[in-house]
Amino acid sequence: MLKTPLYESHMAANAKMVDFSGWSMPINYGSQIQEHNNVREDCGIFDVSHMLAVDIQGSEAEKFLRYLLANDVAKLQENKAQYGCMLNHDAGIVDDLITYKVTDEHFRIVVNAGNRESDVAWFNQNAQNFDVAITPQTDLAIVAVQGPKAVAVIKRVVTKEIATEIEALLPFSFKFFSKWMVARTGYTGEDGFEVILPATQVKKFWDSLLENGAQPAGLGARDTLRLEAGMHLYGADMDTSTTPLERGLGWSVDLSDEHRDFIGKKAYFAKKAQGVDTKWVGVVLKTKGVLRAGQEIDFDNGEKGYITSGSFSPTLKVAIGLAYVPKQADNPVVNIRGKELEVELVKPKFVKNGKSLI
C-alpha cells in the first residue's frame, strides 16, 4: 500500500489507518466527532498528500486547459483558483478538481487520489496537439489547515512577513513562497488553507502546526465536514456515468464563450436541451436513524430517488445526505430496517462557517 510522507507521524499518533484508493490513510486519531467539531470550532489539520498536484506549463497551457476543462480558465487572474469538472466526450465527469493559475503559461491542477493515474493519462492523451508540458509533482506533500482559527495557527509557524501575506489571501487565492504554495481553499465549509510543499519539509511543518494549537483530523471527519458543506465526493456523488447537470454542478460549466470548444461540450448541450428529470438535493432525516449511500427515497407517486452520500451530522445532530430525486414528487420517505421514515428535502448545503443553513 502507498504511504504519504506523514505515515510515521500518523502511526505515532495512534491513528486508525485504512486503505483509501490504495493509500494507507488515517480515518481518525481516536474520536471522529471530536475531530469534526474541532475543525468547526478551532483548527484541524489533514494530511491530503494522497492527492496529486500536476503542473501544466507551456505557451499553450491556457489554450489546452480551455479545451480540457468545462469551466473556463480564461476567466482566471494570476494567483487565483477555480473549481471545475473535467468531462469525457459524453459529458460524463472524469474528475472534479481545482485549477490554480500561476502565470499565463503555468497552471497547477490538484486531482483526486483515486484518479491520479487516470487523470494524468487523460491529460497526456488530450495534450498531443498543444505546446504544453505535463509534470506530476510526486515529490510534493499537501496539508489542509482548516477551521476558524486556521489563520491564527498558521501565523504562528511562519515568519511575520509571510504571515501578513497569508492572512491577506482571499478565498480561492494563493501565493508561492519559494517552493511552498499556500491557497485559501478547502473541503470543509470553514476558513482555511491548503499548503503544497516539498515532501522533505512536511513533517517539520506538521509538527509545528501541532505544537501551535492545531489538532490532527482524519478522513472520517473530512467526509462529514464536506458532506455538511454540500461538497461532492468523486466516485460517490458523481462519476463518468453522470453529467454536471444531474449533480447540481451546471454552474461550473462555462458556456459564455460560444466559440470555445471543450471536451464534452456537444454532449453537454444535447443533455441540456433534452432536460434532466432529476434534481440534486440535500436530505434531512426527521427522526433517529442513519442515512447511507445507496438508500432509496420513495415518493407517494411511486417514483424513487437515491442517496449518494449520507452520514450523521455532528454539527446539526441529525442524519443528512446528498441525493438525486424526481423533479416532481411529494412526501419522501426512506426505508431503514423495515420502517418508513420521513425525510425533508432541502438545498444541498447544510453548514457554512459553523452555522446551520437549514
From Swiss-Prot:
Organism of provenance: Francisella tularensis subsp. tularensis (strain SCHU S4 / Schu 4)
Q: What does this protein do?
A: The glycine cleavage system catalyzes the degradation of glycine.
Q: What is its EC number?
A: 2.1.2.10
For this entry, the protein name equals Aminomethyltransferase
Assembly and interaction partners: The glycine cleavage system is composed of four proteins: P, T, L and H.
- Organism phylogeny: Bacteria, Pseudomonadati, Pseudomonadota, Gammaproteobacteria, Thiotrichales
Name a single GO cellular component.
glycine cleavage complex
Top-level enzyme category: transferase
* A GO BP entry: glycine decarboxylation via glycine cleavage system
Encoding gene (name):
gcvT
Record has Transferase as a keyword: yes
Catalytic reactions of this protein: N(6)-[(R)-S(8)-aminomethyldihydrolipoyl]-L-lysyl-[protein] + (6S)-5,6,7,8-tetrahydrofolate = N(6)-[(R)-dihydrolipoyl]-L-lysyl-[protein] + (6R)-5,10-methylene-5,6,7,8-tetrahydrofolate + NH4(+)
